[in-house]
């Protein structure tokens, strides 16, 4: 079993006298910056000129610098911008300032594992990856609870890489819940697989296929939406709270029997074979090469798929039905970014 770390294993002294640069101020960036600041860590935020996030960070009382100046000022640099822009940002603005003894940190291992970022050998390279979106990382920190996280050491030039990563996790609030030891390869490959085969790709296609099956059979799209998409959250919440057994305990016996007898016909041997193929494509670097090339050539295919998905019947019906659901937090409907 991998090592697990808790509050007793972290020591903020390993960040004492050090400045941490949070590069980016999005979902994770704002949570990391605010939590570390509130834990007594000296924090600066690195944002490009003209960033819309600058005003938000400054309103929160944080010092904002350019990414280059933030990296120059800091002893610890946490990169929390999207995967596809990390390499250029690192190479152009951060790398020149990663002098011996500094720490380069990530919340996801994509660019290190697939060689898009190649740090010098005389710095520490670590990961602290909270297993929750940024708003939950911040919310639970303020409640004194914290979210679980993963920790990994890729380079240990100083001999204190793990200790500093655990100090960061402590300041972030994650050691209250517990942090599990991993490595960059395991985190990256398992994270991508989970996204592609289960959480995003798998779940989305399952929902779309179920919806379309009912609609093609003559059922009202509105009914199909409720049965195949809307109620999914109810089931996922039960699974997250207590596992599959708790979900099955909580639903009707009819639903549970259908689970046992029909579920394996949906996710069958052919599905499992495709899952293995998807994992193999991740492990070999094929997916990474495809995604990197997509970004280098203007994201034409990606943006076309995004627009097509936005205009699917299930999405059109969903936008209409959510107007009825006053119990949902009112959120602006998401459009389709063109770039």
UniProtKB/Swiss-Prot annotation:
One of the record's GO cellular component terms: cytosol
Pathway(s) per entry: Amino-acid biosynthesis; L-isoleucine biosynthesis; L-isoleucine from 2-oxobutanoate: step 2/4; Amino-acid biosynthesis; L-valine biosynthesis; L-valine from pyruvate: step 2/4
Taxonomic superkingdom: Bacteria
Binding positions for Mg(2+) 2 per the UniProt entry: 191, 227, 231
InterPro entries cross-referenced by the UniProt entry: 6-PGluconate_DH-like_C_sf, KARI, KARI_C, KARI_N, KARI_prok, NAD(P)-bd_dom_sf
Domain KARI N-terminal Rossmann: 1-182
UniProt: substrate binding residues: 252
Co-factor binding details: Binds 2 magnesium ions per subunit.
Requisite cofactors: Mg(2+)
Keyword S-adenosyl-L-methionine belongs to the record: no
Binding site for NADP(+): 25-28, 51, 53, 83-86, 134
Enzyme Commission number(s): 1.1.1.86
Keywords for this protein: Amino-acid biosynthesis, Branched-chain amino acid biosynthesis, Magnesium, Metal-binding, NADP, Oxidoreductase
Protein name listed in UniProt: Ketol-acid reductoisomerase (NADP(+))
Species, as recorded: Solibacter usitatus (strain Ellin6076)
């Amino acid at each position: 079993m991998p090592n697990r770390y808790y509050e007793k294993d972290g020591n903020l002294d390993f960040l004492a006298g050090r400045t941490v640069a949070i590069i980016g101020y999005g979902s994770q960036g704002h949570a990391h910056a605010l939590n570390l600041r509130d834990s007594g860590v000296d924090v600066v935020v690195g944002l490009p000129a003209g960033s819309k996030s600058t005003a938000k960070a400054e309103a929160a009382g944080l010092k904002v610098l350019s990414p280059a100046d933030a990296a120059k000022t800091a002893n610890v640099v946490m990169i929390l911008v999207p995967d596809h822009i990390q390499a250029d940002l690192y190479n152009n603005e951060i790398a020149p300032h990663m002098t011996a003894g500094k720490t380069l940190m990530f919340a996801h291992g994509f660019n290190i594992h697939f060689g898009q970022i190649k740090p010098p050998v005389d710095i520490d390279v670590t990961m602290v990856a909270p297993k929750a979106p940024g708003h939950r990382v911040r919310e639970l920190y303020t409640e004194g609870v914290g979210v679980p996280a993963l920790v990994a050491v890729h380079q240990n030039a100083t001999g204190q890489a793990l200790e500093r990563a655990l100090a960061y996790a402590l300041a972030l609030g994650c050691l209250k819940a517990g942090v599990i030891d991993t490595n960059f390869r395991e985190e990256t490959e398992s994270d991508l697989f989970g996204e592609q085969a289960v959480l995003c790709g798998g779940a989305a296609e399952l929902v779309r296929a179920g919806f379309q099956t009912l609609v093609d059979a003559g059922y009202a799209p509105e009914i199909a939406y409720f049965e195949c998409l809307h109620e999914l959250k109810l089931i996922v919440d039960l699974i997250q709270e207590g596992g599959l057994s708790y979900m099955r305990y909580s639903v009707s016996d009819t639903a549970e029997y259908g689970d046992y007898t029909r579920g394996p016909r949906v996710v069958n041997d052919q599905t499992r074979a495709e899952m293995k193929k998807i994992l193999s494509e991740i492990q070999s670097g094929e997916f990474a090469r495809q995604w990197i090339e997509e970004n280098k050539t203007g994201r034409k295919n990606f943006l076309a798929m995004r627009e097509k998905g936005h205009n699917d019947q299930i999405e059109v019906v969903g936008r209409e039905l959510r107007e009825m659901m006053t119990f949902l937090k009112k959120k602006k409907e998401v459009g389709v970014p063109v770039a």
